[in-house]
Amino acid sequence: MAKVPPLIVICGTTASGKSQLALDLAQRLNAVILGADSRQIYKELDIGTAKPTLGDRQTVPHYLIDICEPTENFTLAEYQRQAQELIASLNQPILLVGGTGLYIQAIVKGLKIPAVPPQTNLREQLANLGQPFCYQLLSQVDPVAQSKIEPADVVRTLRALEVFYATGRPISSLQGENPPSYPIVQIGLGLEPEQLQPRIVHRTHAMVEAGLVKEVEGLINQYGEDLPLLHTLGYAEIKQYLQGQISLTQATESIIVHTRQFAKRQRTWFRKDSAIHWFDANQPNLLDSVTKLVQVDVNEGMF
């Protein structure tokens, strides 16, 4: 019987080097990359989401990136469906790469996601209340779900509230797990906060220099200031600058602070999973070490 190609997960905090490791590993293993980032799925959000470049995507096939419009409501269930279909149809090693823990769990653990259609009117009413209020509200009606959602994640927060008010039951109580049968290896890239900080600073300044302000300005002009994605990390701060509330320097520093806080929450999330094999992102011969682990874990010689 032919061996089933494994699903190789590369996760970790923002700015830890996941994308570069994935690109190098994919070329070595003749693999493809599936994105696991809740914002990189959207077209036109390129710089602020650190989306793989067109050159990278030409070097290695990437999927689940640029698959919907900024105004679309893309649910976790839809992400899971598309990812599972790709995994079933691609007959080669696959790297699932990103920092959105819920996306990764949806695939690795086979989360059973409630089949509740979007409630447009309810969602609009909730959105008008503002994310801080909605996030606090979620902590009251479904603290389990709230503990798994980032404070700035407008889409996931609204979805959890939407399910609660549509069904009368917390989304967490409607969820279960149905793990896939194919082999899975999870790789985590870790860095101590003092090592990650310079990377965050460098990347933030690089984003601004690459045209983040123009990107946000274009989104506002095209979709208006109330676009939910403009409330997310990197975009919210630049929007404040464009509205004259803060200077560009203040916006940049604010992004750095918020990114550092986001990375701390990501670290806490991923460290809870004992199945992840952790590597120091700065270690010498990182690619060789990861390649060796992957091959041993799924039976050496598979590739």
From Swiss-Prot:
MF annotations from Gene Ontology: ATP binding; tRNA dimethylallyltransferase activity
Binding site for ATP: G12, T13, T14, A15, S16, G17, K18, S19
Record region (Interaction with substrate tRNA): 37-40
Enzyme class: transferase
Interaction with substrate tRNA, annotated site positions: T100
Enzyme Commission number(s): 2.5.1.75
Record keywords: ATP-binding, Magnesium, Nucleotide-binding, Transferase, tRNA processing
Cofactor(s) for this UniProt protein: Mg(2+)
UniProt GO BP: tRNA modification
Reactions the enzyme catalyzes: adenosine(37) in tRNA + dimethylallyl diphosphate = N(6)-dimethylallyladenosine(37) in tRNA + diphosphate
HAMAP family according to UniProt: IPP_trans
Purpose of the protein: Catalyzes the transfer of a dimethylallyl group onto the adenine at position 37 in tRNAs that read codons beginning with uridine, leading to the formation of N6-(dimethylallyl)adenosine (i(6)A).
Subunit-structure text: Monomer.
Family per record: Belongs to the IPP transferase family.
Name of this protein: tRNA dimethylallyltransferase
Organism: Synechocystis sp. (strain ATCC 27184 / PCC 6803 / Kazusa)
Gene for this chain: miaA
